Regions:
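Short beta->alpha junction loops/turns
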Residues: 1, 91-92, 149
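Conserved SAM/SAH cofactor-binding pocket of Class I
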Residues: 1-42, 48-53
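Mobile active-site "lid"/loop adjacent to the S-adenosyl-L-methionine
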Residues: 44-71
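Phosphate/oxyanion-binding loops and surfaces in catalytic or ligand/nucleic-acid-binding neighborhoods
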Residues: 47, 105, 133
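Conserved Class I SAM-dependent methyltransferase catalytic core
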Residues: 66-123, 127-128
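SAM/dcSAM-binding transferase cores
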Residues: 121-167
Length: 167
């Protein structure tokens, strides 16, 4: 999607890491670079069987029909160096499916962060890092807000202050 790639390039240019990132506009399945990567970061499409929207570009970004977890881990196994890791953010309800899929491609969970909007609410997102080595998984939780709406926790502020103006 050229528009999404242009937006990503614009975001990267205003990032402190702009000299270390590159946007390549192509089908992930057809991407075969000469060198292997040490890190892949992905915010893969979330929706599996949800109602599809009329906007094709938005659908592609949000629904797993174009990039599912099998494809993500299968091709990442090819793209990553032996010590490389893949980090993703997923909806909490697909965590077991994602971990099972990762195992099929010999990826082991290294880090797992459960993200909650506030105390007492169910986990909404899970940030996972996988690698080829079987090591103890570091597990943690993050609460975005305290008891009051938009009363952000110190942990969330520390994590996001460089990216959000409101922090």
């Amino acid at each position: 999607n050229p528009a999404a790639a242009a937006q990503a390039q614009e975001n990267i240019q205003s990032s402190p890491w702009s000299n270390r990132m590159e946007v390549v506009c192509c089908d992930f399945r057809k991407y075969h670079p000469e060198d292997k990567f040490d890190l892949i970061v992905s915010n893969p499409p979330y929706f599996v069987d949800a109602l599809r929207c009329p906007d094709n570009q938005r659908c592609m970004a949000r629904h797993t029909s174009e990039l599912n977890y099998e494809l993500l881990f299968g091709h990442s196994a090819y793209l990553l160096s032996e010590q490389g890791v893949i980090s993703i953010i997923i909806p909490a309800e697909v965590e077991r499916t994602v971990i099972d899929t990762a195992w099929k491609y010999n990826f082991h969970p290294h880090r797992r962060l459960h993200v909650f909007t506030k105390p007492g609410k169910p986990c909404r997102r899970v940030l996972l890092t996988f690698g080829r080595q079987s090591i103890s998984c570091i597990e943690d939780s993050l609460y975005i807000e305290g008891e009051k709406h938009e009363q952000f926790t110190p942990e969330y502020i520390a994590l996001t202050k460089d990216f959000y103006l409101k922090m």
